[in-house]
C-alpha cells in the first residue's frame, strides 16, 4: 500500500502532456483529499475503485510513463491488458469496467469474479480517472434542488428543512447544494468520518450525535429563514423513524446512501460500522438480506414523510428498486430526480462539463472562471453558480471546476481553455471531462433514463454509441462501465476526457469531442420524441436522418 498524492508542477514524467494528464488524474482520484478509502484504491460509492489492485495500479503507472504519443493502452476492469500502435489523434487510453453479459449482470456474479481478482467496480468516475471530489456532483445537486424549489417553494428553499442520508463522495454534495439554495438540511450518516470530511471541506456546517439537537438547530434556522447544514451521526432508519414519531415537519426527503451496493455500501439498522464490517466478511448473504430489509424500512419511512406532505424523490441510488424487490409494492410512488427535475436540461445537451488544472495552481482555475464569465455573460444561472462556487467550494486534490454547459457551449469553452494554455495565461494543460451522469451517455431505467417518453428506458445502445463516437472524435481517454450509481444490472454508461494542451491538434480534438458528446444527448432525447430536443437539433443543425434529414416522416 502506498500513499498517493495529486502531482503538481510543470515537470512531467511521461513522454507527453496527454499521457501525463492521465497519470495525474489517476493520482488525483486517490489523493487523500479526494478518495474515500485510498488505501484500498476506493475512490467513492461503496467500492468504486481506480485500479483492480496495487499490482495493476503500478502496471498502469509504468505503462503510462512509457506510452508513446501514437499508442493506446487498453484497461479491462482496472488492469492494463494491452498497448497497441494507433495514431496521435486516437485516445491514449480506452477503459472498460465491470461490464458483464446481461444474464450474469448481478452482484453475486460480480462478487465471485471480484474475489478471484478478475473484475473491479469502477462506479462512474472512479475507474475512469476523472473524479474531482464532491464538487463534481455539487452543481448538479444544486440545479436539482433549485428546480425543486421552483416547482414547490416559489424558487427558494428558505424556511424549509430537507432530510437526507449518505454523506460520502456523492451524497456529500447535498448539504452545500441545499444551503446554496437557502434551505436547512439534516444529513444522516452512520460513518462519522464522512461527516468530518464534509465539514473540513466546508460542505457541511455542523455535526452532532444528538437527534434532538439536530432538530432544534434545524427548527431555529427554518424559523429565521436562514441556510444551515447539519451532519447527524446515526443510522437513517433509526433517525427517520424517530423524527416521524416526534411529529417534526420535514419539507423535502431524499437519500444518497450507497444503497446501490447492499453488501459493501449500506449499513443495516442495528449495526455499528465495526459490527457491519465483521458480519459482511463472516456471512455476506445474511448481511445482504439485512441490508435489503433495512432499505425497505428506509423507503417506507420516506413514503410516510411524503404522506405527511414532504416532497420526496429518489436521488439515483436505486433504493426504491431494492425496497420493491424486498416486497414493498409502492416503492416507486415517489419519482427519480432526473424525470422530476433534470430531463429538460438533458434535452438541450446540458450536463456536467468539468475541468481540472494539471499545474495544481488555483490561479489557473481563477483565470478559467474569468473566461467563462466573458464567454457566457447572459447565462444568469451559470454566473450565480460561479459566484457561489468561488465563495463556498474548497478544492479537493487538483484545483477544478464544474459548470453545466450545453451543446455548442462546451466546445466553445474547451477551445477557449486551449487558447489560454497556448497563450500562457494558464500555466499548464487542462483536462476536460464529465461525470457519466450526462444527457446522452447513460442507460439507467431507475435514474437517468427513467420514464422516457417513448418507453426506451432500458435501451443500452445509446451509451455504447456515445463511447464509440467520442473515441472516433479523438478523446484522450474514453471509458465504458456497467453498474455505476444504481448497481449491477441496472445501468450502462460512458465517460470521456480530452486534454487541452494548447496545440492545434488539441483544437481539432476538442472541437470534435465537445460537439459529439453533448450532441449525443440531444440526439438521444430527440429520438425519444422530446420536442425541446428536436427543436435544438433543428436550430443547431444536428443531422438526425429520420428527424432533421431526408428521412423525415
Curated annotation (Swiss-Prot):
SUPFAM superfamilies registered for this protein in UniProt: Urocanase
Role summary: Catalyzes the conversion of urocanate to 4-imidazolone-5-propionate.
Cofactor note: Binds 1 NAD(+) per subunit.
GO function term, MF aspect, one: urocanate hydratase activity
Organism: Staphylococcus saprophyticus subsp. saprophyticus (strain ATCC 15305 / DSM 20229 / NCIMB 8711 / NCTC 7292 / S-41)
Gene Ontology CC annotation, any one: cytoplasm
Name of the protein in its database record: Urocanate hydratase
Enzymatic reactions: 4-imidazolone-5-propanoate = trans-urocanate + H2O
First-level EC class: lyase
Amino acid at each position: 500500500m502506498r500513499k498517493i498524492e495529486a502531482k503538481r508542477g510543470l515537470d512531467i514524467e511521461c513522454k507527453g502532456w496527454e499521457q501525463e494528464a492521465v497519470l495525474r488524474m489517476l493520482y488525483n482520484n486517490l489523493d487523500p483529499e479526494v478518495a474515500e478509502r485510498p488505501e484500498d484504491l476506493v475512490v467513492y460509492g461503496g467500492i468504486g475503485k481506480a485500479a483492480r489492485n496495487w499490482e495493476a495500479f503500478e502496471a498502469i503507472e509504468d505503462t503510462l510513463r512509457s506510452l508513446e504519443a501514437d499508442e493506446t493502452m487498453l484497461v479491462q476492469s482496472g488492469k492494463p491488458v494491452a498497448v497497441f500502435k494507433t495514431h496521435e489523434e486516437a485516445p491514449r487510453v480506452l477503459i472498460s469496467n465491470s461490464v458483464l453479459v446481461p444474464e450474469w449482470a448481478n452482484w453475486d456474479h460480480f462478487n465471485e469474479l471480484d474475489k478471484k481478482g478478475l473484475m473491479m467496480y469502477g462506479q462512474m468516475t472512479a475507474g475512469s480517472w476523472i473524479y474531482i471530489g464532491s464538487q463534481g456532483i455539487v452543481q448538479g445537486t444544486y440545479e436539482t434542488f433549485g428546480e425543486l424549489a421552483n416547482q414547490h417553494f416559489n424558487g427558494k428553499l428558505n424556511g424549509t428543512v430537507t432530510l437526507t442520508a449518505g454523506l460520502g463522495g456523492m451524497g456529500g454534495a447535498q448539504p452545500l447544494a441545499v444551503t446554496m439554495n437557502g434551505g436547512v438540511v439534516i444529513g444522516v450518516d452512520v460513518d462519522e468520518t464522512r461527516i468530518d470530511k464534509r465539514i473540513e471541506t466546508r460542505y457541511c456546517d455542523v455535526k452532532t450525535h444528538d437527534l434532538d439537537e439536530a432538530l432544534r438547530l434545524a427548527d431555529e434556522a427554518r424559523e429565521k429563514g436562514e441556510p444551515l447544514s447539519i451532519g447527524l451521526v446515526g443510522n437513517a432508519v433509526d433517525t427517520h423513524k424517530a423524527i416521524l414519531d416526534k411529529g417534526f415537519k420535514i419539507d423535502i426527503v431524499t437519500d444518497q446512501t450507497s444503497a446501490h451496493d447492499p453488501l459493501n455500501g449500506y449499513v443495516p439498522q442495528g449495526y455499528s460500522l465495526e459490527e457491519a464490517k465483521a458480519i459482511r466478511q463472516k456471512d455476506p448473504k445474511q448481511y445482504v438480506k439485512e441490508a435489503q430489509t433495512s432499505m425497505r424500512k428506509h423507503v417506507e419511512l420516506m413514503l410516510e414523510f411524503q404522506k405527511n406532505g414532504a416532497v420526496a424523490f429518489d436521488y439515483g441510488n436505486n433504493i426504491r428498486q431494492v425496497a420493491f424487490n424486498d416486497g414493498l409494492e409502492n416503492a416507486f410512488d415517489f419519482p427519480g430526480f432526473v424525470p422530476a427535475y433534470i430531463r429538460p436540461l438533458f434535452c438541450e445537451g446540458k450536463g456536467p462539463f468539468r475541468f481540472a488544472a494539471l499545474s495544481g495552481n488555483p490561479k489557473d482555475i481563477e483565470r478559467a472562471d474569468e473566461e467563462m464569465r466573458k464567454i457566457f455573460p447572459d447565462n444568469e444561472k451559470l454566473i450565480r453558480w460561479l459566484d457561489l462556487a468561488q465563495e463556498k467550494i474548497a478544492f479537493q486534490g487538483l484545483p477544478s471546476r464544474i459548470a453545466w454547459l450545453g451543446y455548442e457551449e462546451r466546445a466553445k469553452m474547451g477551445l477557449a481553455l486551449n487558447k489560454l494554455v497556448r497563450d500562457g495565461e494558464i500555466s499548464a494543460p487542462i483536462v476536460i471531462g464529465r461525470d457519466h451522469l450526462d444527457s446522452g451517455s447513460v442507460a439507467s431505467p431507475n435514474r437517468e433514463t427513467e420514464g422516457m417518453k417513448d418507453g426506451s428506458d432500458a435501451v443500452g445502445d445509446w451509451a455504447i454509441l456515445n463511447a464509440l463516437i467520442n473515441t472516433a472524435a479523438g478523446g484522450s481517454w474514453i471509458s465504458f462501465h456497467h453498474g455505476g450509481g444504481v448497481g449491477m444490472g441496472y445501468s450502462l454508461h460512458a465517460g470521456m476526457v480530452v486534454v487541452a494542451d494548447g496545440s492545434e491538434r488539441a483544437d481539432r480534438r476538442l472541437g470534435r469531442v465537445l460537439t459529439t458528446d453533448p450532441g449525443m444527448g440531444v440526439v438521444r432525447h430527440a429520438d425519444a420524441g422530446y420536442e425541446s430536443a428536436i427543436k435544438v437539433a433543428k436550430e443547431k443543425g444536428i443531422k438526425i436522418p429520420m428527424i432533421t434529414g431526408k428521412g423525415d416522416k
